[in-house]
Amino acid sequence: MEGAALLKIFVVCIWVQQNHPGWTVAGQFQEKKRFTEEVIEYFQKKVSPVHLKILLTSDEAWKRFVRVAELPREEADALYEALKNLTPYVAIEDKDMQQKEQQFREWFLKEFPQIRWKIQESIERLRVIANEIEKVHRGCVIANVVSGSTGILSVIGVMLAPFTAGLSLSITAAGVGLGIASATAGIASSIVENTYTRSAELTASRLTATSTDQLEALRDILRDITPNVLSFALDFDEATKMIANDVHTLRRSKATVGRPLIAWRYVPINVVETLRTRGAPTRIVRKVARNLGKATSGVLVVLDVVNLVQDSLDLHKGAKSESAESLRQWAQELEENLNELTHIHQSLKAG
């Protein structure tokens, strides 16, 4: 029986070699090995260690990954075993993430009060400017109304002329005289308003630039301190699908995929951009936290801060000082964000 089985295998090998001259058992083994190595390299360079941990510990996540990647059972098992060997690397990166969270906490506790003071000073000054713009505008409107009313004297004088035996002509003459003066006053008031508004806009622009610099510095430091933490902001299910599609492409093309994905070392700028929607970071992170089965309060704090900073920068971009009301509204929204950041700072300080 054993001899018959060996004979069948021998016949199959001859048939395969005749129909596929370049194929050998050793060649297929090397090809699978090369594919596994490429996938391992891909995971090391582009996949978050936390995401890898979820894939290795969640049967549902792994089955979905295998299904989307269209991996045969044998290749999937081999890849799983190879990825398990990366767990020390995952542990190291988890420790690194905890260190960066602690680094962020220490830095934020120390530096934020000074940043808050500078931004608050800008907010208060912007409100003063808004009040001054409104006051000047109101005064100029009153001046224009007064100058316009003097023209009524001339109109009344012409209308009353047939009935007043010329008496109304004196009214008209007075109106003309006042009209000349009021026209000059109207022009002057417009010049005053335009000049002051331009000056106020320049001052507001400088204040905006100052607080923007503070916020951008805060954002850049956050990006530098918390790249691993920011990878949490990506939707886990969608990211799994992206990884599986790239692995599928690797398997079919036998070539390394070049397009960037969820790089945990090189966090793309648009990761921070996606945090603008209020509530989204917390929702996504808690979803990942459920998969991990552990609390991620430190991550939530960092993402809340990043979200508020980015939102505040967006407010800066929209502030053009076109009116006192728009300045007040912008200052109010910025202050609300600053208050939330202050609350986070107080919570961290309380431990």
Swiss-Prot record:
Q: Which UniProt keywords apply?
A: Lipid transport, Secreted, Signal, Transport
Gene Ontology terms: cellular component:
extracellular space; intracellular membrane-bounded organelle
Alphabetized GO MF terms? lipid binding
How far does the signal peptide extend, from start to end residue?
A: 1-21
Protein's cellular compartments: Secreted
Instruction: Cite the record's tissue specificity text.
Output: Widely expressed; the highest levels are in spinal cord, placenta, adrenal gland; also detected in spleen, bone marrow, uterus, trachea, mammary gland and testis; levels are low in brain, heart and pancreas.
**Which Pfam family, any one, appears in the UniProt record?**
ApoL
Could you tell me the Gene Ontology terms of the biological process aspect for this record?
lipid metabolic process; lipid transport; lipoprotein metabolic process
The UniProt similarity line reads: Belongs to the apolipoprotein L family.
Question: Any idea what job this protein has?
Answer: May play a role in lipid exchange and transport throughout the body. May participate in reverse cholesterol transport from peripheral cells to the liver.
PANTHER family assigned: APOLIPOPROTEIN L (PTHR14096), APOLIPOPROTEIN L4 (PTHR14096:SF39)
Listed name of the protein = Apolipoprotein L4
In its UniProt entry, the species of origin is given as: Homo sapiens
This protein's encoding gene: APOL4
